[in-house]
Amino acid sequence: NFPPDIGGIQSLMEGLSKSLAKHGAVKVFADEYLNFRNYDQSSSLDITRIKGFKIFRKFRKAFLVNEYLENNSVKGIFFDHWKSLEYVKSDYLTKFPNFCLIHSKEINHSLGGSLNSRMNKAFKKTKFIIANSKYTKDLAISMGLEKSKIHIINPGTNYPVKIEKEESLKAKVIFGSAFPRLITVARLDKRKSHQNILMTIKNLIPTYPDIKYVCIGDGDEKNNLESLRVQLGLEEQVVFLSRTD
């Protein structure tokens, strides 16, 4: 999970890597992705890409990480997912502080199932488990993870960036005199319940007739959400934008 792939975890790992780079050298192991060469060439990070079929990449990545840890001393290790941690040797992990991030979708595996067993076995090797919310921490505990290892760090954000005049004008066209103005930026998946936001907007119109909601993102649910917008008569109140917009 690393750019130029798009997503919340990808952005988080990029931000984490860039922040850590201010305090010393950072080595990144990540899967190949479309246009990765352009990204890597423009990045100041030392990135090793893993290619091949997905089923084999985790083994290749673990081999490279194990080899690196055998030959280098590091200050800390960060994993984006328990599957990235799974095949890294315990002997190396005991030598260095190590952290694994967790998000609810990636750990929601039924107790007693094979994925849950693999997950718990992997997490026994890590020193710190970083949950992005109290909800995720509680879910992790219910999935069998050690409570004492779990710490909550809510997702951060980059410092405000300069807004170009073109983007500022585009925002004024979209929002006009609307109030209140609501925005979400997320992948449009069923589990994120964007349909509930649309129904809430519908219920708020009597109180806030000038409300405007801008939903930024793409995903499997986009067509369904666009249809729901029409069914609820929210063509004026709800705008869908993709990343390219």
Which role fits each region the language model picked out?
Residues 1-6, 12-57:
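N-terminal strand-loop element at the rim of the active site
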Residues 162-176:
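A short helix/loop element that forms part of the nucleotide-sugar donor recognition site in Leloir-type
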Residues 1-4, 185-190, 204, 219, ...:
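Short donor-sugar binding/catalytic loops of nucleotide-sugar-dependent glycosyltransferases
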Residues 79-85:
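Short His-centered aromatic/hydrophobic patch
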